[in-house]
Amino acid sequence: MSIAGPVHLDGRERAEAVGTDPMVTIEQVRDLASTLPRSYEALVRDRVKFRVGQIVYLAFSRDETLMGFAFPKEERQALIDSEPDKFLMPERSDQRYNWVVVRLEALDEAEMSEIVLDAWRMVVPKRVAVEHLGD
């Protein structure tokens, strides 16, 4: 008799297991981000970005396959090491910021929602987040 260890599925495998489309689109992100207080979309040098005030908390690559997002710098390496096929270091010029990059094809909708909400929460005043999310 063989005892299997824990099964780890990536975003695509999880989505296939539950019968959903694994690829998150910019439209899904836009739909969520547009509901968040003080959040707005901006087009900067042909790239879609979402901001609160002047602070960017989400940004897409020009081809919309990658999404950068606000994330604590001190936790960044652990996140990337946990799923290196999904998460990437930002470009060298952005490494001084609280920022990580994710491949959209590797995300499911639940993960995308968590990332977007956490990134927004990092840049919005705490009371605004509490009022909106009830945390």
Residue ranges and their predicted role:
Residues M1-D135:
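Charge-dense, helix-prone N-terminal extensions
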